[in-house]
């Protein structure tokens, strides 16, 4: 839990430096993927989401502003970008990953349930 608080503090500091990184005209992951994403915290600086993807689960297309992923429970994921690009990643429990704004959908192609904390940066 201490790691999460440190991560949130660092992200708040990044928000001060980098300002607004919101994706305009984007599909909100909390709305389009409400069955797999839950809101944990929202304020003027960040929005923290928890995403859970069971094996074989697929999200709908959505967008994120700049954000950080903290991997609670790892697994293998395939990301499909709005531009048609397809990438695969093997998330390991405890990984912390920074991502620039993007529009994508993801699917769990592994055999374990993936759990992620997503910290989206606001202005």
Each predicted region: which residue ranges?
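Positively charged n-region of N-terminal signal peptides that target proteins for export
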Residues: 1-4
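Bacterial N-terminal signal peptides
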Residues: 6-15
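Short N-terminal segments immediately surrounding and downstream of signal-peptide cleavage
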Residues: 21-44
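Conserved short histidine dyad/triad with adjacent acidic residue
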Residues: 47-63
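Histidine-centered metal-chelating micro-motifs
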Residues: 56-59, 97-107
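Glycine- and acidic-residue-biased ligand/ion/polar-headgroup-sensing regions
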Residues: 64-83
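Short acidic-glycine-tyrosine-enriched beta hairpin
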Residues: 83-101
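Ligand-binding loop in jelly-roll beta-barrel domains
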Residues: 101-122
């Amino acid at each position: 839990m201490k790691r999460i608080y440190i991560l949130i503090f660092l992200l708040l500091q990044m928000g001060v430096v980098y300002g607004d990184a919101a994706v305009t005209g984007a599909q909100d992951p909390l709305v389009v993927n409400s069955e797999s994403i839950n809101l944990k915290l929202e304020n003027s600086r960040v929005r923290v989401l928890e995403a859970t993807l069971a094996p074989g689960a697929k999200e709908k297309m959505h967008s994120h502003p700049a954000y950080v992923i903290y991997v609670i429970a790892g697994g293998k994921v395939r990301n499909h970008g709005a531009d048609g690009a397809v990438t695969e990643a093997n998330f390991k429990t405890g990984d912390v990953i920074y991502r620039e704004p993007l529009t994508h959908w993801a699917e769990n192609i592994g055999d374990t349930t993936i759990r992620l904390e997503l910290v989206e940066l606001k202005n």
